[in-house]
Amino acid sequence: MPYKFNASRRHKIPKARYRVTNWPDYDAALMRRGDLTVWFTEEAVAAWHAPATGERGGQPVYSSLAIETGLALRLVFHQPLRQTEGMLRSIAEVLNVDIAIPDHTTLSRRGGGLPILPKLAARNEPLHLLIDSTGLKTYGEGEWLDQQHGLRSRRRWRKLHLGLDADTQEIVAAELTPDDVGDVSVLPELLDQIDGDVASMTADGAYDGETAYSAVADRHPATAVVIPPRTTAVPSHTTTTQRDRHLAEIAEHGRLAWQRSSGYSRRSLVETAMYRYKTIIGRRLHARILPNQRTEAKIACNVVNRMTCLGMPVTVRVV
């Protein structure tokens, strides 16, 4: 983005201002995010309890649907598992639904390895994919304690890798990893989660290199890859590649002109999506171990997508 090339005076560059043109609709969508209307469909009640496995030994009582519902309510209302168990019991009692409610221990134990599929709106056009990552805290005190008492408390983070649909702003792929895992190494896993054609894939300079281009080409050969090359990058010695064409255009017209012509500026939408995730869900993971944290992150992405589908702002830049 342009301000990144003015690091010495970045603080003097004003932030771009935008005006919302559909404020009544967006205002109504924000209010619908807090709607407490709850119901159980006949299909949900029928699928609430797990079917018999046909094997000897203990049988599961609750289906994956029941566990996912409980964990989703926990994230939406920002409460511990015991309170979530109480909420589920209260909802079943008020609606007079005859279902067994999983206790907090079951919700925690079954959360690890729970298969979570993305809940997305149907699309007919090829996907314009935006990739980026952000950090989520697992434990550790905040900056307030450090500043007030001069302490350096230990912190631990997980890295959340997101793939965003640039048109609908839905999260179409997500993966949670330890914080020492490189962004490029997770790209194949994100691409494998996407069904359908991908028209373009845009990511920041951390993904620059043959690994990212090969990962995209192996799965979607016709996809345009938009990644800013490093300032020290040189053309390849073999057949001209997409990266070579980016380098040639930057050398001829400049990096800012390349950003405008390639559509690289759309990558800021995935940064906005990460801010939306942290605003709705929070900046901290509740689960303690990595398998449960991965389930939590995928359910959280579905929650964010559900709220995104209620309505999004349409903005125009104020000149």
Feature roles, as predicted:
Residues M1-G57, T69, D98-I99, R109-E125, ...:
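Charged, often Cys/His-bearing segments associated with DNA-binding zinc-finger transcription factors
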Residues P14, S64, E68, A72-V76, ...:
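Basic, amphipathic alpha-helical segments enriched in Lys/Arg and hydrophobic/aromatic residues
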Residues P14-A16, Y26, L36, A44, ...:
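Glycine-rich, flexible loop/turn motifs
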Residues A52-E68, A72, V76-R82, G86-S90, ...:
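Polybasic low-complexity intrinsically disordered regions
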